[in-house]
């Protein structure tokens, strides 16, 4: 099995893309925050808080193999946008079998009403572990050649991960294709 050299992902045009592999990613992120607040009554404090949260998310993601960060404005008041962080997770101690990985993740989920639902799904790109929470959806897609997992981390802090947003995120994940 050939290890892919890249991937293709269909993300709607309304989502703002930040390439975390380039040095100028901070300026692109700043551009998004500025555009999101343009023509709206957004306080300087909220704008600064959104910038700080997104920057911290991008920096933490880069430290864990994130390559792309997509953002979608979901409110008129300039609050936190919906986002998609695309990361490469080398196998390391992570089980290469999606069923075993799902079981491993399930064991780490705390009991209670906030417990995320873990399942294994089959995408066009291959088997994937799907982890659904109230405001997040993580899809870990096993790469051909067992090179690792490509992780799609969706977050929708304002409107939640249900209904149309969940279906949109599933459709984006379902569009994943490998480039060999």
Predicted regions, residues:
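N-terminal targeting sequences that direct proteins away from the cytosol to non-cytosolic compartments
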Residues: 1-180
């Amino acid at each position: 099995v050939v290890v892919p050299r890249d991937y293709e992902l269909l993300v709607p045009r309304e989502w703002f893309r930040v390439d975390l592999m380039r040095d100028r990613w901070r300026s692109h992120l700043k551009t998004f925050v500025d555009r999101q607040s343009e023509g709206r009554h957004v306080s300087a404090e909220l704008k600064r808080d959104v910038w700080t949260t997104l920057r911290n998310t991008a920096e933490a993601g880069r430290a864990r193999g994130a390559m792309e960060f997509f953002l979608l404005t979901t409110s008129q008041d300039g609050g936190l946008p919906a986002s998609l962080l695309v990361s490469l997770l080398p196998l390391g101690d992570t089980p290469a079998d999606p069923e075993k990985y799902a079981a491993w993740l399930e064991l780490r989920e705390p009991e209670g009403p906030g417990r995320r639902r873990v399942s294994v799904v089959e995408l066009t790109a291959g088997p994937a572990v799907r982890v659904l929470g109230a405001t997040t959806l993580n899809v870990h897609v096993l790469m051909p050649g067992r090179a690792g997992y490509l992780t799609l981390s969706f977050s929708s802090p304002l409107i939640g991960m249900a209904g149309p947003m969940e279906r949109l995120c599933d459709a984006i994940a379902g569009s994943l294709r490998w480039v060999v």
